[in-house]
Curated annotation (Swiss-Prot):
Belongs to the eukaryotic ribosomal protein eL30 family. GO terms for molecular function: RNA binding; structural constituent of ribosome. It comes from Homo sapiens. Component of the large ribosomal subunit. The ribosome is a large ribonucleoprotein complex responsible for the synthesis of proteins in the cell. Coiled coil: none annotated. This is Large ribosomal subunit protein eL30. The lineage of its organism: Eukaryota, Metazoa, Chordata, Craniata, Vertebrata. Component of the large ribosomal subunit. There is a cross-link at residue 26 (Glycyl lysine isopeptide (Lys-Gly) (interchain with G-Cter in SUMO2)). GO terms for cellular component: cytoplasm; cytosol; cytosolic large ribosomal subunit; cytosolic ribosome; extracellular exosome; focal adhesion; membrane; nucleus. Pfam families: Ribosomal_L7Ae. The modification Phosphoserine is found at residues 10, 16. PROSITE patterns: RIBOSOMAL_L30E_1, RIBOSOMAL_L30E_2.
């Protein structure tokens, strides 16, 4: 019971931080652009939906590991991630280039353990 409440609270805080990034920061949505930003070394944090295809997920994790970029596994599916970003379409992957006023990058490292 307590764990469910904690995950809901952390999900809400992630969603509010994501909305702040969408308003004040720079980001790219989608697999191809995310991969491009990781390879260029511009991505500060990558967020993946939980129903992202395994091959895409492993490829992004591999490139992020090479570029020493943090990867956060979003607890919702791609529809919920798109809604959290304020979009009316599905978002499987997104890369945050500049967080703007949000402290999303500082708040993530405790949740994104490098494997």
């Amino acid at each position: 019971m307590v764990a469910a409440k904690k995950t809901k609270k952390s999900l809400e805080s992630i969603n509010s931080r994501l909305q702040l990034v969408m308003k004040s920061g720079k980001y790219v949505l989608g697999y191809k652009q995310t991969l491009k930003m990781i390879r260029q070394g511009k991505a500060k944090l990558v967020i993946l939906a939980n129903n992202c295809p395994a091959l895409r997920k492993s490829e992004i994790e591999y490139y992020a590991m090479l570029a020493k970029t943090g990867v956060h596994h979003y607890s919702g599916n791609n529809i919920e991630l798109g809604t959290a970003c304020g979009k009316y379409y599905r978002v499987c992957t997104l890369a945050i280039i500049d967080p703007g006023d949000s402290d999303i990058i500082r708040s993530m490292p405790e949740q994104t353990g490098e494997k």
